[in-house]
Design a protein with these regions (language model features):
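Replication-associated primase and helicase/ATPase modules
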Residues: 1-34, 43, 48-49, 106, ...
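Phosphate-handling catalytic cores of nucleic-acid transaction enzymes
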Residues: 309-351
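Short beta-strand segments
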Residues: 172-175, 221-222, 265-268
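Intein modules and their embedded homing endonuclease domains
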Residues: 2-127, 259, 372, 392
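Conserved nucleotide-sensing/catalytic segment adjacent to the nucleotide-binding pocket
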Residues: 210-253
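P-loop NTPase catalytic core of nucleic-acid-dependent motor ATPases
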Residues: 30-57, 98-99, 104-218, 287-289, ...
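Positively charged interface segments
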Residues: 76, 192-194, 199-208, 230-233, ...
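Loop/turn-to-beta-strand initiation segments
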Residues: 216-219, 260-264
C-alpha cells in the first residue's frame, strides 16, 4: 500500500505536497485581494481587468514554490474557479461619480481621496483642482473649431467621463483633411485610458457581434470613418440611446444582457449617411461639428499630441466643467446655429424629399387640395430628373413624405379620388402644378405638362 507523503507544515493550506486545491487557493487569494467577477469581467479597485496577464503573474508567484506540473494550465483552471468564487450577480455602473487615479469625484464637485472600493472603471488621470489651464489644448481647439462649437465638444468629452447615455447623442467632427482633428483622439487616450477603444462605426452597423466589444467601454473612436452610407442603422442607434442593459452577442456564444454606455465619436472627411433609413431619429442623434480651413503655410508640430497630453489634468477639469453644464441642462447639449444647420444639411443630403416638398413650380402646399401617391411620385421623379438628382424608390419616397406629415401639415389617407374616379392612397394638403404623365399627357420621355394650345 502506497503511503501518502507527510504534510509539509510550511506548505500553504491549498497544497498537500502533490496537488493544488483550486477552491482553497481561490479562498486564500480572494481574502487578501479586492476582486469580483461580474458581467463577464473581473473588477478591482483599479477598475475592469482588461488584461489578465498581471493577474496570472500574481497567481504564478504563489504557485512557483510548489513542484507541480503544467503550471500554465493550473493557472487557467484557477482563474476559471475564481470566476465562480468571486462572482456577483450584477455590478451596476455609477453615473453620478468619476473614479480617478487619486480618488472619486462626484458630479456635485465633492472629492474623496483614496481608492478603497472596487469600481467599474477608473481613469488614469488624477484630480488636481489647482491644475493649470490647458493652454496648448485650448489654443489647438481655437485653431481647429469655430468658437461657438467648442462648448459642444467640451460637453461631449465631459459626457464621456461617466457611464451614462442620457444625452443620446454621438459626435462627428468633419473636415477636408489635414486640420489635425484626429489629435483629439490621442488626447482622449491619455484622459480615458483603457476605457476608450478604437473602432469602426461601419463595422458596428454591419456586425451583430461588434456591440459586445463595446461592453464596459466609455468611448469608441472611429479615427477615419469610411464614407459609404450605412446599410443598417439599428445597431448604431441602439448604442447611442441605450440606457441600462441590452442584448449582446459574441461569436459562438449565447446572447446575454450586458451594460452598454459607450459613446461614439467619429472623425471624417464626409457625413455619416444611411442608405435606407430616412427617419429623423438617425440624424437627430448626431452632433456634427465642422473644422476651420487649414491656414495656408501652417507648420504642424509633430509633438503637439504629446505636449497636450502633458496638460491632461487641466483638460480633465475643462471637460468636467462641460459635464456639469450638460447635467445642469438636463443632458441637452449646447448647439450653435452652425451645428444645427450641419445636421439639417446631412439629413437633406441623404433625403431629397424635403427639398422637393419645399420646391417651387412642381407642387404647392395647399390645405384644400389633394394628390394621389402615384401622381406625387411622378412629379418627384420629374423634379429629380430636372435637378440631376437620384430619386428614391417609390416605397422610400412615400415613407419619407408620410414621416413629414406634421411638419408640412399633410394627411395621408385612402380617400383620394384619382383622375379615373377611383379612391386611392394619397395626401391632403398638396396641389400638383407640374403634371408629367398626368391627365393623359405622355411622351417618349417625362417632361413638364404642356397645354394643347402650345403645341399648335
Amino acid at each position: 500500500m502506497t503511503k501518502r507523503k507527510s504534510a509539509n507544515l510550511d506548505a500553504p493550506i491549498w497544497f498537500d505536497g502533490t496537488n493544488i486545491n483550486e477552491a482553497l487557493f481561490c479562498d486564500e487569494f480572494l481574502n487578501s485581494r479586492k476582486i469580483i467577477f461580474a458581467n463577464g469581467a473581473f473588477f478591482t479597485p483599479d477598475g475592469r481587468v482588461t488584461d489578465d496577464l498581471p493577474l496570472r503573474g500574481e497567481i504564478y508567484e504563489k504557485l512557483k514554490c510548489c513542484a507541480v506540473n503544467n503550471i500554465p494550465r493550473k493557472i487557467t483552471n484557477i482563474l476559471e474557479v475564481m470566476k465562480l468564487a468571486a462572482h456577483v450577480e450584477d455590478f451596476a455602473p455609477e453615473a453620478d461619480r468619476i473614479h480617478l487615479a487619486n480618488g472619486t469625484l462626484k458630479l456635485d464637485g465633492s472629492f474623496t481621496e483614496g481608492r478603497p472600493n472596487i469600481v467599474r472603471s477608473r481613469l488614469p488621470v488624477a484630480y488636481r483642482p489647482d491644475a493649470p489651464a490647458p493652454v496648448r489644448w485650448l489654443s489647438f481647439l481655437d485653431g481647429l473649431l469655430y468658437t461657438e462649437d467648442i462648448p459642444t465638444l467640451q460637453e461631449f468629452i465631459g459626457y464621456c467621463l461617466i457611464p451614462s447615455n442620457k444625452g443620446q447623442r454621438m459626435m462627428v467632427i468633419k473636415g477636408n483633411g489635414g486640420e489635425g482633428k484626429s489629435q483629439i483622439g490621442a488626447v482622449l487616450v491619455a484622459l480615458l485610458g483603457s476605457n476608450m477603444k478604437d473602432g469602426s462605426i461601419g463595422k458596428i452597423s454591419e456586425n451583430r457581434f461588434a456591440r459586445a466589444d463595446l461592453e464596459h467601454i466609455l468611448l469608441c473612436v472611429d479615427d477615419d470613418m469610411r464614407m459609404e452610407a450605412l446599410r443598417q442603422t439599428n445597431y448604431v442607434k441602439s448604442i447611442v440611446t441605450a440606457q441600462g442593459k441590452m442584448d449582446l452577442e459574441r461569436k459562438g456564444k449565447q446572447s446575454y444582457q450586458g451594460w452598454m454606455f459607450a459613446r461614439l465619436l467619429a472623425f471624417s472627411n464626409g457625413d455619416l449617411q444611411a442608405l435606407y433609413d430616412r427617419s429623423d431619429g438617425f440624424y437627430r442623434r448626431q452632433l456634427v461639428l465642422t473644422t476651420k480651413e487649414k491656414p495656408a503655410g501652417r507648420i504642424d508640430d509633430p509633438d503637439l499630441a504629446e505636449k497636450m497630453k502633458a496638460e491632461v489634468e487641466g483638460i480633465f477639469l475643462w471637460a468636467f466643467e462641460g459635464l456639469q453644464r450638460l447635467v445642469a441642462n438636463n443632458f441637452k447639449f449646447t448647439e450653435s446655429q452652425r451645428t444645427r444647420d450641419n445636421r439639417e444639411a446631412v439629413k437633406r443630403d441623404s433625403n431629397n424629399v424635403f427639398d422637393f416638398l419645399e420646391s417651387e413650380g412642381y407642387i404647392r402646399l395647399k390645405a384644400d387640395c389633394t394628390i394621389s401617391s402615384k401622381d406625387l411620385y411622378e412629379i418627384y421623379r420629374m423634379w429629380c430628373e430636372e435637378n440631376n438628382l437620384t430619386p428614391l424608390k417609390r416605397r422610400s419616397f412615400s415613407e419619407s413624405v408620410i414621416a413629414s406629415q406634421t411638419k408640412y401639415n399633410l394627411e395621408y389617407c385612402n380617400k383620394i379620388t384619382n383622375a379615373a374616379g377611383r379612391r386611392v392612397w394619397g395626401f391632403f394638403g398638396i396641389e400638383a402644378i407640374a403634371k408629367p404623365n398626368i391627365n393623359g399627357f405622355s411622351d417618349v420621355s417625362e417632361r413638364t405638362y404642356v397645354p394643347d394650345r402650345w403645341q399648335e
